[in-house]
Amino acid sequence: LKVAARLLALTMNMHALRFLPVLAATIITPAFIHAEIAVKSGEKIAFLGDSITAGGWGNPAGYVRLVSAGLEANGVHAEPIPAGISGHKSDQMLARLDKDVLSKKPQWMTLSCGVNDVWHGPRGVPLDEAMAKSGTYDEKVASRGTYKKNITAIIDQATAAGVKPVMLTATVIQENLASKENGLLAPYNAFLRQLAKEKNIPMADLYAMFEKRIKAENKPTVKVLTSDGVHMNGEGNKLMAIGVLKAFGLNEAELDKAKASWPALEVAAVEFAKKQAEARAKAAAEKAKGTPAPKKK
């Protein structure tokens, strides 16, 4: 009888063991381990940046619009605060931080900065003091500070004001990844990654995402993500938006919902581009009809 009881117990235990993988899968499934979307309905998100960010709002299918639509598709009704200005560098963003961002009292701020700091060459912003003394920059370089100090100040001031920053690495300067400009940009992005880690700031490593996509496409003569090597085309805007949404905590299923909301914006973007082209053609025609201004004696 005792032997029979032991055999029965062993059989039951072995039967239970068969269900352990199912139980484990249930416990560690992504639905259980995935954190909630960090942004909540009613919160404001400031998008601080340069022309890439300005276009990200001005274009109906720009990355700022796509991020907003993607959150909406997942039930998060956040208010975007566009704060991108064409040509701006880190010193200019720092100078207008209070007016364009902090005064609006957002809960979040994405920071996209670095392309112009490098791309503007002698008029750019050096990474650090050593670079400032390299002889590369014009006589006004001291007034622009350094990228490291400017970015750190932006993050610290935002945090002190209760704003949660999200760091975006600067996107490519030319889709030729071996370009001189991309080489110069590399230490700037390395600094951003380091600072985000030190301050425990969410990050969208957009440069790494762009690099991976450009290499995968392997089309040296085709602009894959940009219209001119710097500013985004439709695919570039979508990739930027995906990076930002991931930084906000969206999982793959939530990203799929976000992407499903984008085609309507892309249709609007086509119409927007058409109207812009018509306006440019009209302006050019009017200019051609006009008489040149008289030369000064």
Where are these regions (language model features)?
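Bacterial N-terminal signal peptides
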Residues: 18-31
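Catalytic nucleophile-elbow at a beta strand-turn-alpha helix junction centered on a G-D-S/GDSL motif
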Residues: 43-58, 89, 118
